[in-house]
Amino acid sequence: MSTVADPRDIIIAPVVSEKSYGLMEQNVYTFLVHPSSNKTQIKIAVEQIFGVKVASVNTVNREGKRKRTRTGYGQRKATKRAMVTLVAGSDPIDIFGGATA
């Protein structure tokens, strides 16, 4: 991706899972991101979209699973996740529009 990409093209969606809810208490937020984006682009995108300061970004590339279907085998698409840590003392991100778990 180029450096002038729209931040909303980089951050696809928040990850909704038990683990991501637990990490939110430690100011760590998990997002699905575009597979070709790098950590610098992710950091800039989160800061622009949510108006917060990011301390660090960790990324995980997840391979798509091979799944069996009625007609043979298929493949789930590979995804990339980013765990974004905010600076200590910063305001929390209101991702889901309500109280967190």
From Swiss-Prot:
GO molecular function, a single term: structural constituent of ribosome
GO cellular component, one term: ribonucleoprotein complex
InterPro entries: Nucleotide-bd_a/b_plait_sf, Ribosomal_uL23-like, Ribosomal_uL23/eL15/eS24_sf
Disulfide bonds: none
Keyword Coiled coil: no
SUPFAM superfamilies in alphabetical order: Ribosomal proteins S24e, L23 and L15e
Protein purpose: One of the early assembly proteins it binds 23S rRNA. One of the proteins that surrounds the polypeptide exit tunnel on the outside of the ribosome. Forms the main docking site for trigger factor binding to the ribosome.
Family: Belongs to the universal ribosomal protein uL23 family.
Subunit structure, as described in the record: Part of the 50S ribosomal subunit. Contacts protein L29, and trigger factor when it is bound to the ribosome.
Name listed for the protein in its UniProt record: Large ribosomal subunit protein uL23
Naturally occurring in which organism (per UniProt): Corynebacterium jeikeium (strain K411)
